[in-house]
Amino acid sequence: MSDLQASTAAGQRGPADHSIRDQIIEAADEHFSRYGYGKTTVADLAKTIGFSKAYIYKFFESKQAIGEAICARCLGTVTTAVRESLAQGKSATDKLRRLLKTIAVSTTEIAFNDQKIYEIAAYSCAEKWASSTNYLEEISGIIADIITEGRASGEFERKTPIDEAVRAIMLAFQPFMNPVMLQYNLEAVPEGVNEVTGLILRSLAP
């Protein structure tokens, strides 16, 4: 199980594969999409789904736990898109370009297609939910692997400690991967993404 998959269990109760759990998540996803995460209570969800609050609490310990499950699923679509794109990469340089572009485009699509669900992603980043922190750890791990590959092939410099290089790349790309920051940088996609990517690659050059 990946870190991102593990994060979906945060605050959940009962069998992980229980159909009722999925039903609650689906209904909550739809409700949050319509009314927003911040304005919704567990009582609202219970009324919408037709369950009692007590029954929902058998599967989730809080509204945040439900939000975590939705957020993890949402961020999971981003990492899936990233890995599918990386599978087509021809070099470490190409893979890093693909990684950063896919993250920016996928996150932007979420922002445009479902603003209310995007709100949950923003909550997760601002409040450092497990679904968000594990997502960032997974992306950091992918970047570390790409840097290692690039150093082995002679594409990237070898002086900077890998963990330092990864942190720097993650910090530089925050405006396009952090939902809280991206909402203020939507007009910079894709030109700004390409410029930041170019700057990152030049810093990695031997």
Model-derived segments and their meaning:
Residues M1-S19:
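N-terminal intrinsically disordered/low-complexity leader segments
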Residues D3, V105-E109, S140, A144-D145, ...:
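Amphipathic C-terminal alpha-helical segment
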Residues Q23, A27, H31-A65, A69:
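Helix-turn-helix
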Residues R34-G38, Q88-G89, I110, S153:
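Short coil/turn segments at alpha/beta junctions that flank glycine-rich nucleotide-binding fingerprints
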Residues A69, R73, V82-E109, I162, ...:
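Hydrophobic alpha-helical connector segments
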Residues G76-T79, A126-S153, D163-R167, E191:
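Amphipathic alpha-helical packing segments from all-alpha helical-bundle domains
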Residues S85, D114-A121, V180-Q183:
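Secondary-structure edge/capping motif, primarily at the C-terminal ends of alpha-helices
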Residues T102-A144:
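Short secondary-structure transition hinges
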